[in-house]
C-alpha cells in the first residue's frame, strides 16, 4: 500500500500473502537458515493455519517435535501492513501460544541446559518466559530477549533482570525506558537505563541508522549496510537469529553484531518473514562487499 491507513480510512493494497510467522518462529528459521543447530518450541491450534505452520517449519529444516497442537485453540496470527517505503505495523493475536504455562517448561530443561544461547520474545505468557529465563540462568546459559510486544513495561523488570542480552528496536526502547532514541546520544541513554535493570549487553536496533551496542565497558555504533529496502517485517527477527548463530559459534561481540546486522539487512530486501531470512553464504558475501 502507498501509506498505512488512518483511523476510519479504507485503502487498496497491491496484494497479500499468508505464511509462517511469529517472532519465535521467524528467529528460529533465521538461525536455522544461517546454519544454527536450533531447537524451536512453539504451539499452534488444530486448524488449517496450524497445519500450514507446521508444514512450513519443516520445509525450513526445523524439527517440529516440540511444536504442540492445542485442542480448542486457534493458531496465533499476526496481521502485518506494509507501506511502499517498507515500514510496517503488526497486530498479534496469541491464540494457542497463550496456552503455555510455567509448569510446561520443565520438560524442556535438558535442552535449555545444552543451549549456548536461548532466544525469548513476548508473544507467549510472561510467566513462561520467566520460567525459561530462570532455567537458563540455573544452567549457566545466556538469554537474548527480544522485548516485543512490550505491552505493560512495568511487568518486565524481572524478565529483563534475568536476560544477559536485550535487543529492543527504537520503539521498544522508548516504551520500556521512556527515552525516545532520536539520535545516537539518546539511544545510548535508553540503553544505559536498560543496563541498570540487569542485562550485561544492550543492542538497540535503529533501523536505517544501524545499531548501537552498549555495555558497562563500551559504546559502539554500527553503521547500516547499504541495501534497497523492500519490507522491514523480518529485519529484527533476522538480526536476532543472526546474532544467536554468531554467538553460539564463539565469535567476538562486535562480529556477532556485524553478522546480525548483515542478516537483517539482507532480509529487508525481500518480502516476507522467515522466508526473507538469508543464508550464511549470503551474509558472508555482504560482509565481504561492505566492510
Residue ranges and their predicted role:
Residues 152-153, 157, 184-291:
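Conserved phosphate-binding/catalytic region of the ribokinase-like
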Residues 31, 169, 236:
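Short, conserved phosphate/pyrophosphate- and ester-handling motifs at nucleotide-, phospho-/glycolipid
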Residues 15, 41-46, 65-75, 146-148, ...:
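Beta-strand->loop->alpha-helix junctions that form or flank phosphate-binding loops
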Residues 61, 98-103, 145-151:
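Short gly/ser/thr-rich secondary-structure transition/capping motifs
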Residues 43, 66-70, 80-117, 122:
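Conserved phosphate-binding/catalytic loop of the ribokinase/pfkB sugar-kinase fold
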Residues 1-59, 228-230:
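Glycine-rich phosphate/adenosyl-contacting loop at the front of the ribokinase-like
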Residues 32-33, 137, 248:
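Gly/Ala-rich phosphate-binding loop of Rossmann-like dinucleotide-binding domains
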Residues 117-189, 208-211:
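Conserved beta-alpha-beta core of the PfkB/ribokinase-like small-molecule kinase fold
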Amino acid at each position: 500500500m502507498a501509506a498505512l491507513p488512518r483511523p476510519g480510512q479504507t485503502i487498496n493494497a497491491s496484494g497479500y500473502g499468508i505464511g509462517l510467522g511469529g517472532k519465535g518462529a521467524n528467529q528460529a528459521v533465521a538461525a536455522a537458515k544461517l546454519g544454527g543447530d536450533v531447537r524451536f518450541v512453539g504451539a499452534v491450534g488444530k486448524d488449517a493455519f496450524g497445519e500450514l505452520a507446521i508444514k512450513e517449519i519443516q520445509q525450513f529444516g526445523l524439527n517440529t517435535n516440540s511444536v504442540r497442537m492445542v485442542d480448542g485453540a486457534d493458531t496465533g496470527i499476526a496481521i502485518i501492513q506494509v507501506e511502499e517505503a517498507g515500514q510496517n505495523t503488526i497486530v498479534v493475536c496469541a491464540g494457542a501460544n497463550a496456552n503455555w504455562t510455567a509448569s510446561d517448561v520443565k520438560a524442556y530443561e535438558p535442552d535449555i541446559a545444552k543451549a549456548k544461547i536461548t532466544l525469548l520474545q513476548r508473544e507467549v505468557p510472561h510467566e513462561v518466559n520467566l520460567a525459561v529465563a530462570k532455567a537458563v540462568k540455573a544452567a549457566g546459559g545466556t538469554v537474548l530477549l527480544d522485548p516485543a510486544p512490550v505491552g505493560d513495561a512495568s511487568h518486565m523488570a524481572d524478565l529483563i533482570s534475568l536476560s544477559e542480552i536485550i535487543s529492543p528496536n527504537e520503539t521498544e526502547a522508548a516504551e520500556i525506558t521512556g527515552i525516545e532514541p532520536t539520535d545516537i546520544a539518546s539511544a545510548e541513554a535508553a540503553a544505559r537505563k536498560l543496563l541498570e535493570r540487569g542485562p550485561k549487553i544492550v543492542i538497540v536496533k535503529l533501523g536505517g541508522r544501524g545499531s548501537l551496542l552498549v555495555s558497562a565497558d563500551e559504546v559502539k555504533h554500527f553503521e547500516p549496510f547499504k541495501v534497497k529496502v523492500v519490507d522491514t517485517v523480518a529485519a529484527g527477527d533476522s538480526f536476532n537469529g543472526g546474532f544467536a548463530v554468531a554467538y553460539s559459534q564463539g565469535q567476538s561481540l562486535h562480529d556477532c553484531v556485524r553478522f546480525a546486522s548483515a542478516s537483517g539487512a539482507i532480509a529487508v530486501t525481500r518480502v516476507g518473514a522467515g522466508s526473507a531470512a538469508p543464508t550464511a553464504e549470503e551474509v558472508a558475501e555482504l560482509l565481504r562487499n561492505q566492510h
